[in-house]
């Protein structure tokens, strides 16, 4: 019922100009920007007073599992938003508490008659918003919500797919190709508009409603390094300009070459800014659209140009009506794979102490900076789940949710189900080798040396497998394996073969139960990304991974190929079609698997 109410409100018309002057509150949540903010424009329209509010729960900040890097990014984004509002003779009101407790007080204290906010498609958000809308109605407050966090109306996609979300990217593309183009971004709120509805700003505003510091929220900042990613709309728009400066990749569908620089944070990366709404996905979409038409002389851009944004929409659509999307139990689209419970192995993976330098360097970068390349995410996700440790993807979701700047409910959980072969037509017989993949990407090992300085003196020949280095080399490097750096947590060659066989048996049992054929040729999600244009340069590759994963290498596999898949260079066969099984449809109960 809550979802129904929230969805209905999402399409509520904005009040027309000339409406009796309202006292409006615009509630910022994810859309931390002034550009393309239709809900903010609805708050301003016909209002005598507008206050821009962000509700922050200090108790949640102190007790949640979200890491310090994401909190820092959020606070920087709020500071930037407040700075932009100051230029419009307004301020951001950061109110401490929970929405259900805060709004009744604000409605009375400020005489609020209109509440506006951006529609939230995720299950928790819809439930929260339905409760607030009910509360507002009882208080006589008009509620206006506008959809600007996604390109499409997700409910319409589901309706066109027979009242269920499409569970393959190919099907998703087919649905949206029948829909109208996304709405264009709306204009920026102007100083003249804000001047006509100025709210009174008290002298003690910073003390009462200012953006708190990390220390005020209880985070220890001693030893915290400088932010690699600066939060805020201003930074997001500057990055977008840099992102689009390289016209060649749009014109020629250049596929970026994977190299060591690809693994480092790029100044054109956009994923955290899309996640927090510092950058409008619609602005990004149409800036890409316009640039393509300019370069290609008015040719209509193909869907593949927007691949990263569409992966994001795909996962949002799959999750919008599934509150169990981030867990196995009760999740109708998730195969119930009997994962092992191994807290010790999970902890070593999360802390970067697996004994595989490639995996440990990635997890160290994630913990330090809050971001890793999309293929690095694939590597560590495969290692934790079906590749080596056979630990549930749910554990990976929780770790990424803590550490990733760009993690959100839909994309994070969807990517983990996808990479662990738990949903979305993945191929279980391909594994990332925790030695070979890194070595092909960065033969010199500079990435390892950057994040694992203990190993910096190892020669490149041994830096990806230091346990094979002679004792003399280990001593010369002042790093004895098993003493100064851990031995490998598993034998990858043996474990990956065993796990591929386990996954094969699970799929065969499931196939017999459902009457499906594992060898049936079905459309693969790799077809749509045969031109992965959404990554403009090798240094940018993966910077938008939150907007959706890239497919694993694909192609028919012989028995020998299946056993040797651990050594397959990832990313080299992305444009080939896969032959995979059709996974269970949403009606499959968890117990049946």
Curated annotation (Swiss-Prot):
GO molecular function, one term: FAD binding
SS bonds (residue pairs): none
Cross-link Glycyl lysine isopeptide (Lys-Gly) (interchain with G-Cter in ubiquitin): residue positions: 30, 126, 242, 348, 475, 504
Domain of life: Eukaryota
UniProt note on tissues of expression: Expressed in all tissues examined including fetal brain, fibroblasts, heart, brain, placenta, lung, liver, skeletal muscle, kidney, pancreas, spleen, thymus, prostate, testis, ovary, small intestine, colon and leukocytes. Highest levels in heart and skeletal muscle.
Pfam families given in the database record: DNA_photolyase, FAD_binding_7
Annotated segments matching region Required for inhibition of CLOCK-BMAL1-mediated transcription: 390-489
Region of interest (Disordered), residue spans: 532-593
Cellular component aspect of the GO annotation: Cry-Per complex; cytoplasm; cytosol; extracellular region; mitochondrion; nuclear speck; nucleus
Modified residues (Phosphoserine): 90, 266, 299, 554, 558
Gene Ontology BP annotations: blue light signaling pathway; circadian regulation of gene expression; circadian rhythm; entrainment of circadian clock by photoperiod; glucose homeostasis; lipid storage; negative regulation of circadian rhythm; negative regulation of DNA-templated transcription
Activation/inhibition comment: KL001 (N-[3-(9H-carbazol-9-yl)-2-hydroxypropyl]-N-(2-furanylmethyl)-methanesulfonamide) binds to CRY1 and stabilizes it by inhibiting FBXL3- and ubiquitin-dependent degradation of CRY1 resulting in lengthening of the circadian periods.
Required cofactor names: FAD; (6R)-5,10-methylene-5,6,7,8-tetrahydrofolate
Cofactor note: Binds 1 FAD per subunit. Only a minority of the protein molecules contain bound FAD. Contrary to the situation in photolyases, the FAD is bound in a shallow, surface-exposed pocket. Binds 1 5,10-methenyltetrahydrofolate (MTHF) non-covalently per subunit.
Record's subcellular location: Cytoplasm; Nucleus
Function: Transcriptional repressor which forms a core component of the circadian clock. The circadian clock, an internal time-keeping system, regulates various physiological processes through the generation of approximately 24 hour circadian rhythms in gene expression, which are translated into rhythms in metabolism and behavior. It is derived from the Latin roots 'circa' (about) and 'diem' (day) and acts as an important regulator of a wide array of physiological functions including metabolism, sleep, body temperature, blood pressure, endocrine, immune, cardiovascular, and renal function.
Protein family (similarity comment): Belongs to the DNA photolyase class-1 family.
Subunit composition and interactions: Component of the circadian core oscillator, which includes the CRY proteins, CLOCK or NPAS2, BMAL1 or BMAL2, CSNK1D and/or CSNK1E, TIMELESS, and the PER proteins. Interacts with TIMELESS. Interacts directly with PER1, PER2 and PER3; interaction with PER2 inhibits its ubiquitination and vice versa. Interacts with CLOCK-BMAL1. Interacts with CLOCK. Interacts with BMAL1. Interacts with NFIL3. Interacts with FBXL3. Interacts with FBXL21. FBXL3, PER2 and the cofactor FAD compete for overlapping binding sites. FBXL3 cannot bind CRY2 that interacts already with PER2 or that contains bound FAD.
Protein name as annotated: Cryptochrome-2
Gene this protein is translated from: CRY2
């Amino acid at each position: 019922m809550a979802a129904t109410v929230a969805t209905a409100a999402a399409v509520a018309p904005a009040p027309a100009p000339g409406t009796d002057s309202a006292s409006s509150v615009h509630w910022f949540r994810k859309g931390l920007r002034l550009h393309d903010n239709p809900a903010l424009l609805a708050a301003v329209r016909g209002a005598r007073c507008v206050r821009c509010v962000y509700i922050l729960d200090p108790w949640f900040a102190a007790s949640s599992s979200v890491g310090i890097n994401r909190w820092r990014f959020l606070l920087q984004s709020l500071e930037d938003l407040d700075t932009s509002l100051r230029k419009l003779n307004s301020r951001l009101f950061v109110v401490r508490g929970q929405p259900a407790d805060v709004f009744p007080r604000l409605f009375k204290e400020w005489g609020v008659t209109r509440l506006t906010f951006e529609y939230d498609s995720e299950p928790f958000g819809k439930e929260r918003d339905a409760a607030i809308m009910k509360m507002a109605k009882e208080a006589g407050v008009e509620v206006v919500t506008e959809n600007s966090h996604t390109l499409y109306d997700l409910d319409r996609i589901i309706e066109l797919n027979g009242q269920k979300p499409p569970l393959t990217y190919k099907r998703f593309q087919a649905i949206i190709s029948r829909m109208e183009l996304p709405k264009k971004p709306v204009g920026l709120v102007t100083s003249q508009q804000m001047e006509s509805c100025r709210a009174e700003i008290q002298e003690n505003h910073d003390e009462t409603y200012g953006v708190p510091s990390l220390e005020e929220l209880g985070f220890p900042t001693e030893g915290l390094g400088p932010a690699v990613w600066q939060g805020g709309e201003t930074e997001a728009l500057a990055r977008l300009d840099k992102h689009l400066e390289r016209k060649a990749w749009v014109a020629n569908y250049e596929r970026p070459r994977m190299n060591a620089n690809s693994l480092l944070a790029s100044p054109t990366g956009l994923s955290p800014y899309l996640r927090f709404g510092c950058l409008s996905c619609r602005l990004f979409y149409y800036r890409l659209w316009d640039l393509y038409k300019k370069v290609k002389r008015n040719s209509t851009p193909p869907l593949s140009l927007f691949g990263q944004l569409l992966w994001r929409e795909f996962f949002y659509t799959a999750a919008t009506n599934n509150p169990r999307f981030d867990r196995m139990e009760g999740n109708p689209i998730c195969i119930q794979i009997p994962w092992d419970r191994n807290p010790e192995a999970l902890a070593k993976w999360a802390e970067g102490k697996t004994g595989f330098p490639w995996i440990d360097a990635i997890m160290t970068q994630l913990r330090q900076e809050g971001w890793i390349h999309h293929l690095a995410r694939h590597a560590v996700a495969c290692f934790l789940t079906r590749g080596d440790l056979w630990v549930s993807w749910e554990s990976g979701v929780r770790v990424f949710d803590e550490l990733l700047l760009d993690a959100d409910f839909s994309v994070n959980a969807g990517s983990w189900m996808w990479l662990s072969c738990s949903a979305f037509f993945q191929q279980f017989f391909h594994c990332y080798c925790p030695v070979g993949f890194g070595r092909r990407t960065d033969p010199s090992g500079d990435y390892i040396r950057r994040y694992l300085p203990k190993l910096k003196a190892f020669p490149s020949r041994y830096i990806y497998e230091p346990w094979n280095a002679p004792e003399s080399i280990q001593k010369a490097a002042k790093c004895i394996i098993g003493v100064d750096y851990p031995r490998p947590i598993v034998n990858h060659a043996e474990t990956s073969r065993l796990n591929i066989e386990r996954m094969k048996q699970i799929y065969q049992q499931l196939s017999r139960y459902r009457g499906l054929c594992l060898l049936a040729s079905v459309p693969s999600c790799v077809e749509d990304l045969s031109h992965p244009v959404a990554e403009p340069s090798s240094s940018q590759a993966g910077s938008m991974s939150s907007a959706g994963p890239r497919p694993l290498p694909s192609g028919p596999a012989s028995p020998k190929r299946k056993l040797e898949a651990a050594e397959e260079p990832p990313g080299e066969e992305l444009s080939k079609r896969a032959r995979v099984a059709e996974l269970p449809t949403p009606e499959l109960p968890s117990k049946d698997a």
